[in-house]
């Protein structure tokens, strides 16, 4: 029998109970109904009066196609998930201020309704900042140019636009009857995203902004709880949640809120020039079991299906087009085994113990030097236990409840009845399946070269250098910087070619002088800035310098997005002249947004007939290539092998596949043990090889015959190496 509580302890409990009651009342008031269909207490979310252990997975609707959605959702359900989590992508839905788009891959309502049809719930992360390795963190670029705007702080113009979008999404979900109290699948919403770490560098406006965001969100009366991830000071009734590789250390900021893990990272993203990360499923399962055994009640796998950064949606900069993330369902929609199957078995074990887990707190017993037992006992006598071995190298035999159990290193066994071990996180029974790429189509090419000497009617001239994004508004990756330099008789007397130096904020740059290419330079994920230094041949009189600056995705992490820059910011100098060095930064420059081929729409069937195409262009830079092909037989996923090419973009039947880049991964790829703390540089592959070789082409984009493939090659490559392949396991 437990000792009677002291008066102080009893008073403390009364305060905690009263606080919980006040939060429950606040939540019910925000719901706008007498009894909230979805509420929470300190153990878990409560749905229609029932506490739940909820297993969730992230599937981002724009990173796959509507035709893929039903299959992905069903595979998530078959894998034992209860919830599908997705961000809402502001820049996809409001590409132009006040003009909204909710069709095709951005048909959010259709996606949510498909989840409902499958019998699953939805966690809708409205944000609208998403990070997500998504272009500009999900913010529309036009927001950067709203007068007086300052991002993610206590700023009137920013808050007005953010509130307008959040209310737009909430209103749309309500009008479609998609919140749980309306009979829909949405049980939870999120405002902002990982803002807590920004508060320390965000200045005096950071905390007021976070509080405003929470109050604004609750005021929309969604009828479901709101969360803020990585926001330790999230105000009531908002729940603060954890993101990370591990979250067993986490506790919510109030003892009447449940412990929730909104991003359990199943792997990591790939950047151009980086290795390909892999997270062993034994460690992932171990991390999830650790969280549950310590009272966690909501786990979301980020990502459960990563998908593809189609078009120019990848952020970073330098985030790859593949967003596979080593997820249980791979980029192409196929099961990644053994990860998918092992997690399914974990979920079954957790669900067997769910009634006990949500009704009792664990007691902790030491059963060895590195071993512990977390035991849950319900009032009705039901019992569940988690037996844990934290040693990274040694398997052990332990005794619990009079029985002996084998515990591999770095593992947890789950006993739903405190007797039978039905699952161990390090014991993988599912076979490993290695996917194969099967080349099935080669191409007959035609080519068209960009004219680097011509300027369109939209070009304009201005004194000095300008920031690229302020000109392009991200309508194109490309901006031409063109100027003229007069070389006098005495400037070239030494016989040595002048040295051109160009400083750029990123991300890639090509230099042409008098129409001749003088090479390219580019930055990387860790340092997007770059410098061009090269000897260029010039003649007496007027010389034309053309610099093509290329963006490779806009930053997705930070707070003051209004301060991000890209493009040639200077200085630009010409040296090794007899007259010394010329600073070209402040003279007249002519600017042109985009390439001629983009303006003509060469990536479309109609636009491709606007120019005269010739034979294959080989290794020429800034060249468009096109080919027609028939779709491979069957239904296997399809991918393009671009490993023989340089850098550029791809379209199939006018659909923008994305950026491609044969950028080799730097750094080392050592051995990989599942045991021990995981981080993003552990268990990498492809070091010294291409970060990405294969590019997903959704089947729904193909027709039986006469498909048009268009390639924009910036540097030059070997067209003979390009092929279309099917992916099988």
From Swiss-Prot:
Name listed for the protein in its UniProt record: Beta-galactosidase 4
Enzyme class, first EC level, given as a word: hydrolase
GO cellular component labels: apoplast; plant-type cell wall; vacuole
UniProt KW keywords: Apoplast, Glycosidase, Hydrolase, Secreted, Signal
GO BP annotations listed: galactose catabolic process; plant-type cell wall modification
Catalytic reaction list: Hydrolysis of terminal non-reducing beta-D-galactose residues in beta-D-galactosides
EC number: 3.2.1.23
Top-level taxon of origin: Eukaryota
Signal peptide region: 1-35
Gene3D superfamilies named among the record's database cross-references: Galactose-binding domain-like, Glycosidases
Active site: 194 (proton donor), 263 (nucleophile)
Family: Belongs to the glycosyl hydrolase 35 family.
PANTHER family, A to Z: BETA-GALACTOSIDASE RELATED (PTHR23421)
Database matches in InterPro entries: BetaGal_gal-bd (IPR048913), Galactose-bd-like_sf (IPR008979), GHD (IPR041392), Gly_Hdrlase_35_cat (IPR031330), Glyco_hydro_35_CS (IPR019801), Glycoside_Hdrlase_35 (IPR001944), Glycoside_hydrolase_SF (IPR017853)
Cross-referenced Pfam families: BetaGal_gal-bd, GHD, Glyco_hydro_35
Subcellular location, record wording: Secreted, Extracellular space, Apoplast
Molecular function terms from GO: beta-galactosidase activity
The keyword Secreted is annotated on this UniProt entry: yes
């Amino acid at each position: 029998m437990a000792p009677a509580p002291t008066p102080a302890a009893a008073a403390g409990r009364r305060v905690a109970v009263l606080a919980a009651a006040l939060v429950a009342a606040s939540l019910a008031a925000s719901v706008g109904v007498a009894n909230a269909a979805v509420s929470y207490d300190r153990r878990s979310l409560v749905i229609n009066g029932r506490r739940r252990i909820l297993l969730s997975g992230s599937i981002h609707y724009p990173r796959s196609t509507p035709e893929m959605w039903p299959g992905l959702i069903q595979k998530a359900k078959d894998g034992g998930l209860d919830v599908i989590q997705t961000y809402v992508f502001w820049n996809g839905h409001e590409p132009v201020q006040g003009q909204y788009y909710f069709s095709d891959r951005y048909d959010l309502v259709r996606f949510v309704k498909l989840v409902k049809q499958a019998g699953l719930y939805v966690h809708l992360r409205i944000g609208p900042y998403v990070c997500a390795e998504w272009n500009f963190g999900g913010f529309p670029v036009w927001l950067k140019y709203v007068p007086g705007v300052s991002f993610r702080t206590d700023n009137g113009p920013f808050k007005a636009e953010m509130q307008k979008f959040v209310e737009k999404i909430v209103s749309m979900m309500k009008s479609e009857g998609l919140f749980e109290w309306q009979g829909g699948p949405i049980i939870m919403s999120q405002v902002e995203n990982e803002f807590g770490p920004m508060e320390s560098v965000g200045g005096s406006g950071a905390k007021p902004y976070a509080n405003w965001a929470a109050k604004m969100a609750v005021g929309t009366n969604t009828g479901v709880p709101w969360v803020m991830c990585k926001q330790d000071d999230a105000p009531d009734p908002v729940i603060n949640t954890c993101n990370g590789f591990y979250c067993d250390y986490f506790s919510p900021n109030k003892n009447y809120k449940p412990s929730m893990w909104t991003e359990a990272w199943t792997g990591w993203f790939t950047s151009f020039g980086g290795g390909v990360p892999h997270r062993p499923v034994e460690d992932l399962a171990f991390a999830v079991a650790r969280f549950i055994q310590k009272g966690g009640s909501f786990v979301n796998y980020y990502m459960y299906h990563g998908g593809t950064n189609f078009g120019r949606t990848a952020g970073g900069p330098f985030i790859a087009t593949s967003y596979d993330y080593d997820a249980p369902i791979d980029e192409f929609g196929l099961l990644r085994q053994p990860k998918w199957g092992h997690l399914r078995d974990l979920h079954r074990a957790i669900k067997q113990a769910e009634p006990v887990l949500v009704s009792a707190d664990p007691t902790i017993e030491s059963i060895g030097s590195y071993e512990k037992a977390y035991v849950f006992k319900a009032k009705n006598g039901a019992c569940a236990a988690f037996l844990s071995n934290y040693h990274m190298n040694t398997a052990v035999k332990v005794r619990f409840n009079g029985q002996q159990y084998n515990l591999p290193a770095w593992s947890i066994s789950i006993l739903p009845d405190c007797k039978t071990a039905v699952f161990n996180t390090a014991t993988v029974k599912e076979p490993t399946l290695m996917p194969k790429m099967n080349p099935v189509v080669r191409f007959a090419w035609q080519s068209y070269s960009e004219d680097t000497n011509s300027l369109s009617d939209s070009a304009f001239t201005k004194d000095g250098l300008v920031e690229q994004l302020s000109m392009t508004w991200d309508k194109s990756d490309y901006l031409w910087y063109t100027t003229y330099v007069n070389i006098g008789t005495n400037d070239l007397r030494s016989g040595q070619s002048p040295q051109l130096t160009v400083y750029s904020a990123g991300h890639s740059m090509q230099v042409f002088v008098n129409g001749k290419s003088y090479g390219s330079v580019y930055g990387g994920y860790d340092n997007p800035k770059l410098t061009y230094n090269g000897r260029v041949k010039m003649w007496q009189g007027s010389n034309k310098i053309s610099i093509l600056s290329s963006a490779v995705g806009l930053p997705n992490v930070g707070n003051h997005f209004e301060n991000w820059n890209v493009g040639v910011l200077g200085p630009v100098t010409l040296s090794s002249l007899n007259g010394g060095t010329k600073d070209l930064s402040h003279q007249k420059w002519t600017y042109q947004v985009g390439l001629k081929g983009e303006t003509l729409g060469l990536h479309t069937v109609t636009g491709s007939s606007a120019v005269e195409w010739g034979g294959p262009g080989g290794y020429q830079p800034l060249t468009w290539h096109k080919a027609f092909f028939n779709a491979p037989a069957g239904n296997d996923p399809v991918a393009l092998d671009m490993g023989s090419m340089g850098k550029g973009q791809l379209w199939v039947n006018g659909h923008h596949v994305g950026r491609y880049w044969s950028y080799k991964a730097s750094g080392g790829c050592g051995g990989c043990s599942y045991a021990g703390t995981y981080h993003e540089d552990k268990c990498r592959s492809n070091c010294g090889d291409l970060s990405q070789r294969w590019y997903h082409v959704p089947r729904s984009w193909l027709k039986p015959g006469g498909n048009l493939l268009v390639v924009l090659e910036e540097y030059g490559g070997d067209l003979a190496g390009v092929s279309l392949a099917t992916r099988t396991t």
